[in-house]
Design a protein with these regions (language model features):
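Conserved catalytic-core segment of clan PA serine endopeptidases
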Residues: 1-47
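Short Gly/Pro-enriched turn/cap motifs at secondary-structure boundaries
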Residues: 27-30, 74, 105-109
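Acidic glycine-/aspartate-rich tracts in secreted/extracellular proteins
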Residues: 3-7, 42-46, 71-73, 122-124, ...
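Short glycine/Trp-rich loop-beta-loop segment that forms part of the substrate-binding cleft
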Residues: 40-46, 52-81
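C-terminal cap/linker of serine protease catalytic domains
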Residues: 129, 133-157
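Short beta-strand-centered aromatic/proline hotspots
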Residues: 83-93
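Extracytoplasmic
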Residues: 34-36, 62, 99
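Catalytic nucleophile loop of clan PA
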Residues: 106-131
Length: 157
């Protein structure tokens, strides 16, 4: 349900999956640098609700990043199907060619893996630069969108 807000807030109806794809090295041997997935939908819902920009760059990213998603541990409960979107922003602590680390004060939990990690750019608006993959005690981590992954993601549009 794109733009879902609450139990009944479904302004764009629904879309269903027609194809699933995941990073081959993640599937074969759990390689965390290839931990990404794509769900192809039965409609071009992005033509109705808009598209999040995508970007890759060779150099390091700086500044803040935001993660938005539907965490499971919200509003005093633990939901399998949380209907409320939350977003948090934090500084990038480090990144390299394959991964990006951002500080723990960017609150994420189970259910947000696969969410976009994004920044705002004047020329492209809100733009995904990584894919959230998880957290540990002090840091969140995302898979950076590098050139090959950028081209793969764009091919689904």
């Amino acid at each position: 349900y794109p733009a879902r807000e609450g139990k009944d807030g479904k302004p764009y109806s629904s879309a269903t999956s027609t194809k699933l794809e995941a990073g081959g090295n993640w599937v074969k041997n759990g390689d965390v640098t290839d931990d990404w997935g794509v769900i192809q939908l039965n409609s071009n819902i992005g033509n109705k609700v808009g598209w999040l920009g995508l970007k890759y760059q060779a150099g390091a990213y700086t500044g803040n990043v935001t993660v938005a998603g539907y965490p499971r541990d919200v509003r005093g409960g633990y939901y399998f199907d949380n209907p409320y979107m939350f977003k948090h922003t934090s500084a990038i602590s480090s990144d390299d060619k394959w991964r990006m680390l951002y500080y723990k004060n960017l609150d994420t939990s189970a259910g947000q893996s696969g969410a976009p990690v994004y920044q705002y750019y004047a020329d492209t608006g809100y733009t995904a630069i990584a894919i959230h993959r998880g957290q540990n005690n002090s840091t969140n981590v995302g898979v950076r969108i590098h050139e090959w992954l950028f081209n793969k993601l764009v091919s689904y549009r």
